[in-house]
Amino acid sequence: MDRAPQRQHQASRELLAAKKTHTSQIEVIPCKICGDKSSGIHYGVITCEGCKGFFRRSQRCNAAYSCTRQQNCPIDRTSRNRCQHCRLQKCLALGMSRDAVKFGRMSKKQRDSLHAEVQKQLQQRQQQQQEPVVKTPPAGAQGADTLTYTLGLPDGQLPLGSSPDLPEASACPPGLLKASGSGPSYSNNLAKAGLNGASCHLEYSPERGKAEGRESFYSTGSQLTPDRCGLRFEEHRHPGLGELGQGPDSYGSPSFRSTPEAPYASLTEIEHLVQSVCKSYRETCQLRLEDLLRQRSNIFSREEVTGYQRKSMWEMWERCAHHLTEAIQYVVEFAKRLSGFMELCQNDQIVLLKAGAVEVVLVRMCRAYNADNRTVFFEGKYGGMELFRALGCSELISSIFDFSHSLSALHFSEDEIALYTALVLINAYRPGLQEKRKVEQLQYNLELAFHHHLCKTHRQSILAKLPPKGKLRSLCSQHVERLQIFQHLHPIVVQATFPPLYKELFSTETESPVGLSK
């Protein structure tokens, strides 16, 4: 009996297994461009999915980016989207090319070098795992009351850059990682973006808070009150406010009242909360305001606009899907740095992000909008609504531009956007919350902080001009409706090219658990 076909089949299986092993080993090396978790060799260089997609798009449209500084911008997980020119130059300098060799065609010298780097990374991880870990549980925490928070990616690495003085956002040493405990298990891509995976203990305690320069009012168990803040919302209320804040659709006076069991906070503590939210916002801004203002004179030419209009519908949808997904990842990082957010149960973290992340992106968009000529910053320059004609959803684009125009008329400061977007995200009226009271407490604290800041800066009048929450929900619904139409026309494009996080948040097509847990 001829066993040649059997041997050939066995060899093929072994080759496939070897390739999978090589890929998994390569992924221990961080992205050479930005330092994020890599996903393999792309265009000749070990990169993450984000840098792979960025390079692919830049080559597809022969993009000509420009740098507003000295063409030496640092490129890391936090700043990689701030300067496309320097990011592309780093890609090219490190050898990314459409003509780059495949992994299987590497020379022996290249393979040996790669193997040595893999071994180095594995040794570093092994050393970290062997380091002793001292963990102090919170006072009074017992058994199931001890909360653990899962941060999502292998070895606790987050998708975006971390600041060393923000423990909740820092990468967890492997020694802190252990299997998830009790509670719901999430395997979706939103969790992968920073809320699930190997769990990292981030229990809060008063002692830990003091050591980190924070006070106990950061927890959801502590409430700020108008009396302790020296605020009287009845006195400061704008004449046109009426009963704003008493329902789920406005941002007037605080929506919830303090509870007897919740400790009060002082004016100093409210000031600290304002500063904490604003700091978290500054560290997770996709683009710096000064850069956006400097670029306002850099407008797409008529020829460039025509080029965008001639693109296929699916290509423009893919581009916008990737840009929106990147913006959402920054919102995820912002949420994790918000005081009290990581103390919510995991289900409620997911619910708030799935419902509010795009709403936060829409509010942040007003920073990139120029009301003088009704243009928005997109892929390095400013352009009007006509730039997005190929999407085939002019009504949605017009609604988004109108919303940005209305917000820009309020002349928000960066701190006001920080506090406003925190309230957009932390909304106790979202359906599906399991511990609604905790979210109410956190929302109440943030509302007091927002009102305190507006009173301090004599800007209370903007409360009457803020768009109702229903407006943001309407824009998000329009987006989902247009996506459903596009998905019906181009299902393969959505399945094959759209980011997993985008598909999970918006697509109506349910993916298999296997696909979600990759």
Curated annotation (Swiss-Prot):
Pfam families: Hormone_recep, zf-C4. Residues 269-508 form the NR LBD domain. One of its GO terms (molecular function) is nuclear receptor activity. Residues 109-118 have a biased composition (Basic and acidic residues). The gene is RORC. This is Nuclear receptor ROR-gamma. The keyword Nucleus applies. A zinc finger (NR C4-type) spans 31-51, 67-91. Residues 1-30 are annotated as: Modulating. Residues 105-183, 238-258 are annotated as: Disordered. A motif (AF-2) lies at residues 501-506. It is found in: Nucleus. Residues 31-96 bind DNA. Keywords: Activator, Biological rhythms, Developmental protein, DNA-binding, Metal-binding, Nucleus, Receptor, Transcription, Transcription regulation, Zinc, Zinc-finger. Residues 119-130 have a biased composition (Low complexity). One of its GO terms (cellular component) is nucleus. The AF-2 (activation function-2) motif is required for recruiting coregulators containing LXXLL motifs such as NCOA1 and NCOA2. Belongs to the nuclear hormone receptor family. NR1 subfamily. It comes from the Eukaryota. SMART domains: HOLI, ZnF_C4. Nuclear receptor that binds DNA as a monomer to ROR response elements (RORE) containing a single core motif half-site 5'-AGGTCA-3' preceded by a short A-T-rich sequence. Key regulator of cellular differentiation, immunity, peripheral circadian rhythm as well as lipid, steroid, xenobiotics and glucose metabolism. Considered to have intrinsic transcriptional activity, have some natural ligands like oxysterols that act as agonists (25-hydroxycholesterol) or inverse agonists (7-oxygenated sterols), enhancing or repressing the transcriptional activity, respectively. Interacts (via AF-2 motif) with the coactivators NCOA1, NCOA2 and PPARGC1A (via LXXLL motif). Interacts with the corepressor NCOR1. Interacts with CRY1. Interacts (via AF-2 motif) with PROX1. Interacts with FOXP3. Interacts with NR0B2. It comes from Pongo abelii (Sumatran orangutan). The keyword Zinc-finger applies.
